[in-house]
Swiss-Prot record:
UniProt subcellular location: Mitochondrion
Signal sequence extent: none
Role of this protein: May play a role as an NAD-dependent dehydrogenase in the mitochondria.
Organism placement in taxonomy: Eukaryota, Fungi, Dikarya, Ascomycota, Pezizomycotina
Record SUPFAM superfamilies: NAD(P)-binding Rossmann-fold domains
Keyword field: Mitochondrion, NADP, Oxidoreductase, Transit peptide
Protein name: Putative oxidoreductase bli-4, mitochondrial
Organelle transit peptide residues: 1-55
EC number of the protein: 1.-.-.-
């Protein structure tokens, strides 16, 4: 054994126990409890000042707005990050209730129809143009929810551009049911080039707004009767959009010439979606509030479905934008909501909302909308112009007492 090795063994034998603790453990200092500062001596942070509290509240509010904007417009995980909570599974039981949905055979309308039937709606009238599209929707309902649920769904052909025919459809519904709890004004013309109906009225306004006014006005007595007899809230929704912001800034709704002016695909569409919000505001003032004291009441709200993958955003968008439309139809597709996510705010509006005159965004948040969308004066202009155009283009005697909604009726 070498001399150096013998010296190392001798040194090891004389080490104290603490020196045998592993090196890593010896690096941790052992502090006695007496050396710890009393908790009372630890300085506390002063309370936030009013200015600091206000700043932090503004930051939080700003973050909430961002979360809501994302949830309101995009699908997938983004759909669920908003500050409000509602899912299609939260839809209440609808046993005994009856609904009408325009455009309920496809897209968002189908998402709404499917959900209402799934939650035991007793009868559903779907109004649309093409029987073959409805047949496909009905087959899907039968396959997924059962034939019993499919047997509750009835189809009536309806072209909302044709107000006289729309009136006939509404009168037929009143013969086929003794109650109506839900009306979904969903069908509409998307972002497309300008055109005029046979009445000589802009197609966007004639379909998206005025056709639904005719339908709603004819059905209103039945809606009110249902509210009075059941003592419940009867609900109407108008399919609007955040693209109501694309309506011309100078919109006044003062004349037929104004709404027939070609303001571009986005402007045409945006103006008609602005009308849906204003209609809800007007209805709240002229119908809902006048029912106070009744057993039940009828409320109307407008909704924003978000950026949804539908025929409008995949196919129709190429009519006004043959090339650039691919950005919406294809590149943006991964970020869109599906038809069921797009249906969420409408389902909330027609099953849960108790207040009217709101613009409800996904999943269940009432937003203010643009300045134009908040103008009662503009709402009055819109509905007076609507009354005037419908009465002049269909039957002069159809409106005799002015502007209240129950007077905007095309007599068959």
């Amino acid at each position: 054994m070498s001399t150096k090795l013998c010296q190392r063994i001798a040194r090891t034998a004389t080490l104290s126990p603490t020196s045998l603790v592993p090196r890593s453990s010896r690096l941790i200092p052992i502090v006695s409890s007496a050396a710890v500062r009393p908790s009372s001596a630890i300085p506390t942070r002063r309370p936030f000042s009013t200015t600091e509290s206000r700043y932090l509240a503004n930051v939080q509010a700003g973050m909430d707005k961002i979360r809501d904007a994302i949830a309101e417009n995009f699908g997938g995980p983004a759909h669920n990050i908003g500050t409000t909570s509602f899912s299609l599974d939260d839809t209440p039981d609808l046993s005994g209730k009856v609904a009408v949905i325009t455009g309920g055979s496809e897209g968002i309308g189908y998402g709404v129809a499917y959900t209402l039937i799934k939650h035991n709606l007793s009868k559903l009238f779907i109004l649309s143009r093409k029987r073959e599209v409805f047949d496909g929707a009905l087959a899907s309902i039968a396959s997924e929810l059962g034939q019993d649920k499919a047997d509750r769904v009835h189809w009536i052909q309806c072209n909302l551009e044709d107000w006289a025919q729309t009136a006939v459809v509404a009168e037929q519904i009143k013969k086929d049911t003794d109650r109506l709890d839900i009306l979904v004004n969903n069908s509409g013309r998307g972002i497309m080039t300008a055109g005029l109906t046979s009445y000589g009225v802009d197609k966007h306004m004639a379909t998206n707004h005025m056709g639904h006014v005719v339908l709603t006005s004819h059905l209103l007595p039945l809606l009110q009767k249902t509210a009075e007899e059941t003592g419940e809230t009867v609900r109407i929704s108008n399919q609007s959009s955040n693209l109501h912001s694309a309506a011309p800034k100078g919109t006044q709704f003062k004349s037929l010439e104004e709404i027939n002016e070609d303001v571009g695909p986005n402007g045409q569409y945006g103006r008609s979606k602005l009308a849906g919000i204003l209609y809800a505001r007007y209805f709240d003032r002229e119908v809902t509030r006048k029912m106070e004291g009744s057993k039940g009441r009828v409320v109307m709200n407008a909704t924003h479905p978000g950026f949804v993958s539908t025929k409008q955003s995949v196919k129709d968008i190429h009519e006004p934008y043959p090339i650039s439309g691919f950005a919406i139809s294809h590149l943006a597709e991964p970020f869109k909501k599906d038809q069921f996510e797009g249906a969420v705010p409408t389902v909330y509006a027609v099953t849960m909302a108790n207040e009217g005159g709101q613009w409800i965004c996904a999943p269940a948040k009432a937003e203010a909308g643009t300045d134009l969308a908040q103008s009662d004066e503009l709402a009055d202009n819109l509905m007076e112009l609507t009354r005037k155009i419908i009465s002049e283009k269909t039957w002069p005697k159809s409106v005799a007492k002015g502007c209240p909604m129950d007077d905007v009726v095309v007599h068959v």
